[in-house]
């Protein structure tokens, strides 16, 4: 899809990794960092993964790219508010200083789609999180929001180069 818009997509699983090596995870990490260093932008899939929030690896990648001053875009195929997803996963109740979960730990409640650090990283680049108006039929494979980010990246990158 990136090629249709004049971009070259870099996907972490494209890295060549020796799965028999003793340090496979470190090799994967180094390969991913190498790709991020090579990239001019990131389109982060912030769809909640194995819990109410984005994948921690993707959160790291977004922060890494932001720290390097590279264009940051993101999307989530789940447009619901973070605190609502936490509620679906378990108890959320009022605490002394805000909402807490069943263990009494604070639950972030800023009416955002995910953790404030992720959402506002995108805001810094004037690229708000892209979410679908209606939930997609296939949360994991629908590329509508991703394509919207690819279009936005193309416009921003080519406008910058012009």
Feature-to-residue mapping (PLM):
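Conserved catalytic or regulatory cores that recognize and/or transform ribose-phosphate-containing ligands
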Residues: 1-162
């Amino acid at each position: 899809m990136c090629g249709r818009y004049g971009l070259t997509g870099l996907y972490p699983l494209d890295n060549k990794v020796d799965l028999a090596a003793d340090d496979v995870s470190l090799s994967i990490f180094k390969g991913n960092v190498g790709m991020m260093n090579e990239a001019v932008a990131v389109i982060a899939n912030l769809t909640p993964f194995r819990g109410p929030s984005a994948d921690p690896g993707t959160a790291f990648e977004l922060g890494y790219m932001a720290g390097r001053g590279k264009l940051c875009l993101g999307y989530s195929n789940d447009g619901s508010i973070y605190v609502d997803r936490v509620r679906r996963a378990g108890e959320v109740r009022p605490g002394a200083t805000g909402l807490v979960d069943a263990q009494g730990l604070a639950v972030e409640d800023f009416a955002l789609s995910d953790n404030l650090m992720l959402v506002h990283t995108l805001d810094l680049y004037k690229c708000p999180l892209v979410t679908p108006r209606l939930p997609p039929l296939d949360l994991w494979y629908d590329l509508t929001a991703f394509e919207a980010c690819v279009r936005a990246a193309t416009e921003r990158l080519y406008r910058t180069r012009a």
